[in-house]
Amino acid sequence: MIVVQTLFIHIYQIQFVITRRYRIVNQTILNRVKTRVMHQLVSSLIYENIVVYKASYQDGVGHFTIEGHDSEYRFTAEKTHSFDRIRITSPIERVVGDEADTTTDYTQLLREVVFTFPKNDEKLEQFIVELLQTELKDTQSMQYRESNPPATPETFNDYEFYAMEGHQYHPSYKSRLGFTLSDNLKFGPDFVPNVKLQWLAIDKDKVETTVSRNVVVNEMLRQQVGDKTYEHFVQQIEASGKHVNDVEMIPVHPWQFEHVIQVDLAEERLNGTVLWLGESDELYHPQQSIRTMSPIDTTKYYLKVPISITNTSTKRVLAPHTIENAAQITDWLKQIQQQDMYLKDELKTVFLGEVLGQSYLNTQLSPYKQTQVYGALGVIWRENIYHMLIDEEDAIPFNALYASDKDGVPFIENWIKQYGSEAWTKQFLAVAIRPMIHMLYYHGIAFESHAQNMMLIHENGWPTRIALKDFHDGVRFKREHLSEAASHLTLKPMPEAHKKVNSNSFIETDDERLVRDFLHDAFFFINIAEIILFIEKQYGIDEELQWQWVKGIIEAYQEAFPELNNYQHFDLFEPTIQVEKLTTRRLLSDSELRIHHVTNPLGVGGINDATTISET
């Protein structure tokens, strides 16, 4: 009970700070952010059957009433054809007796509404902190953008740093717990800061390293930081009495260095097992994931480094076993591609290889300290998209495909005008979907291909192929359904302790539904559905028609490859599929999978007889 009371005090303190700060922010921006947080929250509460509610439909419009203690909340919403997703279409009213007032007070709503499961006050208050921090940081971001409007994007990096709307379903889409507003300004991707990395030299026996074929670590390191910095680092190492071949040089995010390394590894720095080398000169911008650093010099590698913060409800550290799997999975995927002429020569899919992974693993530390630094120090080196583009090609992140410029004009507007909305959309869907279903059906591999993990490669706006990234914890398979080319992979097992804190993070499973729905959830439910809804809103192409095009692309693939056994194991046309309950995960323990069944727009039935099945 004491913990809960402390959390209440913490919340009120945050609210006081917010109230004071809001006196100087643009009220229009503030209202827009509060409304977005409120709408995404309420949509997810209904969608995941978290709250007790009533719904009735008149002329296709849903009238919803959420039950509260001594109050109720009313609004209208539509149920889309895309997995029954809820889109709120009116202001939300709080009703007490005969009085009704429009509200965006999501903290009051969460404390008043009746849940469908026993309410955990501590988890609830922690979730409220995430929502408040999302409101703070998105308001800060939008106000900064208004005062410093970015130029119209032209290159991949421009789009990467411009499209900063965040998750369109998750209500705490920009929480960044652990960052102050000052930290957010210095390290948040919304502000396109120039960031320099700190570097450590660590005794090799304290580091687990995984290296892709044909990679020479020190040569790659020298190319990344430059000859002058590399030689300076070597001198530092030798001055400490060590040899460069006896240590590993690992980059550290400056926030992580200040808040974690300097504190939790102070003893190791003092006894010399961890040596601080200093700062390198090359500049990086943080990508939308925050922990992936994008070099301004596009000849260099992306560096994914842990930051001990929480964003969209996920810890942004790097679990050691996933780092240690990075290069193996990269070599596995690229070997599959070399043996698959359709994937290599027709689809020409790009896999941005994670060619080097290093994680700090000191078994001599006490169990307590090992827990403290778990996943807090390590790096994954990833190939740069610019290394892969040829001739007239350019690339754009998938999340930028449903984003707009400062005047509200979609980034894809000129392409739609040039090629026509129907022709462009059909081409885009074919280019995006065929590689994903080929890897699933032919090789038995599903990818967690949400918008941050996919890039569209195009020639003058015409979609030609895709690039994929983030494989170290973003693929899933059932071994008996792998193709011969894919059957030879040895993985570092997930520690039992990691399963207890994140039961959703695994690569291999015995449940084939969890393979199929891994693709359905990230790719179709979050990624493609968002683009389809955007196309309908902006260009008037009916949502249901677009899903028929998607279904046609899958059926055409099956006709071209009729012999594949995996069609019976990974049926993308089943009436319902399982998707993750993202908000429920914040309100209950994360020790088990939180999933529910939703209507599949590719399956039989459809919107007219769709119901979301409640699973608590």
Swiss-Prot record:
Quaternary assembly: Forms a mixture of monomer and dimer in solution.
Naturally occurring in which organism (per UniProt): Staphylococcus aureus (strain NCTC 8325 / PS 47)
Family (UniProt): Belongs to the IucA/IucC family.
Pathway(s) the chain acts in: Siderophore biosynthesis
GO biological process: siderophore biosynthetic process
Enzyme Commission code(s) on record: 6.3.2.55
GO molecular function: acid-amino acid ligase activity; ATP binding
Alphabetic keyword roster: ATP-binding, Ligase, Nucleotide-binding
Induction: Up-regulated under iron-deficient growth conditions. Repressed by Fur under iron-rich growth conditions.
Protein name according to UniProt: 2-[(L-alanin-3-ylcarbamoyl)methyl]-3-(2-aminoethylcarbamoyl)-2-hydroxypropanoate synthase
InterPro entries cross-referenced by the UniProt entry: Aerobactin_biosyn_IucA/IucC_N, IucA/IucC-like_C, IucA/IucC-like_synthase, LucA/IucC-like
The keyword Ribosomal protein is annotated on this UniProt entry: no
Highest taxon above the source species: Bacteria
The reaction(s) this protein catalyses: 2-[(2-aminoethylcarbamoyl)methyl]-2-hydroxybutanedioate + (S)-2,3-diaminopropanoate + ATP = 2-[(L-alanin-3-ylcarbamoyl)methyl]-3-(2-aminoethylcarbamoyl)-2-hydroxypropanoate + AMP + diphosphate
